[in-house]
Amino acid sequence: MNIDEDSGTTVLRHDSKYEPNRSIQTMLFGRPLATADAPEQTIGKAIGLAVFSSDALSSVAYAPQEMLMILAAAGSTAFGISVPLAFAICGLLVILTLSYEQTIHAYPGGGGAYIVSRDNLGELPAQIAAAALLTDYILTVAVSVSSGVAQIVSAFPAFFNLKVEIGVAMVLLIMMINLRGVKESGYAFAVPTYFFLISMFITIGYGLIRYATGTLGQVIDAPRDFLDSMTVLQPVTLFLILKAFASGTTALTGVEAISNGITAFKEPRSSNAGKTLILMATILGSMMLGITFLSNHIGALPSEEETLISQLARTAFDSRGILYLVVIAATTIILVMAANTAFADFPRLSALVGSDGFLPRQLAFRGSRLVFSRGIVALSAIASLLIIIFQASVTKLIPLYAIGVFLSFTLSQAGMAHRWWKTGKLKTGEEIVERGSTLRPDKNWLFKMIVNGFGSICTAVVMTVFAITKFTDGAYVVIILLPVLVYCFYAIHRHYRNLAKHLSMETFVSAGRISRHRVILPIGGVHRGTLAALRYAKTLSDDITAVHVSIDEEETRKIQQKWETWGDGTRLVILESPYRLFLEPLLKYIDEIDETRQANDIITIVVPEFVPRHLMANALHTQTAVELRMAFRFRKDIVITSVPYQVD
């Protein structure tokens, strides 16, 4: 036993002084960051607004249009309903903002709906929230990028047939930027976000000035493709209004993002995140009302060929000139950048769920740039697949959207309401430490419980309306998918739990010493690689048996002669193979030895293995080690060891 004289322990810490080498990876994504650099990778309120709010802010580019597309079923006369619906959506936004502002201060470690549900509602609601949010983040990328592509097509119709290719390329670009790290991606996305906000407020402000002065006219050559496709008009019913409202609530997706990413903010984290949330809600509500009101006034029509933003911009500025192109460019960029909110939160949430054992644990490991690289790559792959399947159509993707996020809204706020109820039962000075936060008495617990409870009811109603009104349009896919995902989460968790049980040391009884160590050395010939493997085998045991499967009698005779010269006295067993099989006779021989093995005996199969200079050359050699490893992977007390021999 080696005991350190200074510490008196067998456990020693050693500084490897390792510095990562420069490579293509470092050129693309930057130098690797040490764990100690993590505090420097946090962001302030200005960058935080760009990173975590681009999804919510950009939704004004498609949410008003989706409302009009539903109302178009009753004709253009029904478009006036969109304005009161926009006010109703803003009212719901206020409720959500108040609720999530409380969540941010109650859970400074972040986690959002997943952590809140886990701590207050239980394991099953937490997994439902995780499934809902992860689904929503994937759809956020697909919808945002597809909407951005729609803006490009509005300005440049020649690119219509390249929508899918452009969309996938945009996803890959965002993935590359995010793999460089939170701080760098934050700076990269800040400029486009503020560029969009400035251009939109100029457009809305100028439009309102022209409206007030009576100089804002009607949109010229409004696209009628979608309206003309309505051969039979429907009456304005409560169902139609609710369906339009449900489509408009997609503007609220992304509100929860800041509460999920609190740990990315500089200290004081909760304060900075809370202020960012309030600022985001104020900007979002203002743009939603402004765009809906002006679009309704100028007679803009919903269309697959030209977006509402495009019609509003060219009408406000009276042309498709430079200001129009600036607005279209800014909107396109922010819609693509909106996907970044999902790239910021999906990896964090999947890491949380993975660390709890409900997703592969690899998702919880940070990459060289202190980001959850595997989560970023997984999100990119799935979102790209959706863009391909749905041909980058926002209208086809929207019905899948929002159910997941409103389900997570409902669970998060219900969990917070339950948390405040628990807080109200605490006595002065009493504390309860939970996994995600610490419960302390709060004199305002009743008011906070009412706010969260009312918010939970509101979002549950919206979710139900969305599920019913959008069911046949595609919402049924998400309704079926969520239970399937939750089942998969539990299957993964069951695997990890069973593995932990088998690896547990609690009931472990140390096995006796190995009484006999038998080494089997399969050889196909006698050469330097064989002798290197034999030399290693002799360090393990004196009980070594070389084995050759005889397929060619003349070749076997040559091997036998060489072995007598180079085998160093080690016995060689020749296995006859009349059917010219290699693996099966060898496995049969090992099985025979295994049957005679005593309780504390162990068998090691030492396999010589060529390592060619060129990777492609592996295809020219038999993969005996791999085949044996697969054959014995479930066999107890049989060890497969490869001895590589580098061929220079």
Describe the residue ranges of each PLM region.
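Extracellular/periplasmic helix-exit of transmembrane alpha-helices
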Residues: G207-Q218, K275-Q311
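Cytosolic C-terminal regulatory domains/tails of membrane transporters and channels
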Residues: M1-A38, N498-T507, A511-D648
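Membrane-interface "cap" regions at the ends of multi-pass membrane proteins
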Residues: N2-P64, I70, L98, G109, ...
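Membrane-interface loop-to-helix entry segments
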Residues: I174, L179-T213, T276-M280, I398-T410, ...
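Helix-loop-helix junctions that connect adjacent transmembrane segments
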Residues: Y194, F201-T253, T469, D473, ...
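Extracellular loop-to-transmembrane helix junctions
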Residues: L68-G109, A113-R118, G122-Q127, V143-M170, ...
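Loop-to-transmembrane helix boundary motifs in multi-pass membrane proteins
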Residues: E123, K163-V168, A264-S286, G354-I388, ...
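C-terminal membrane-solvent junction of multi-pass transporters and transport-like membrane proteins
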Residues: P223, Q362-S373, L411-F471, H502, ...
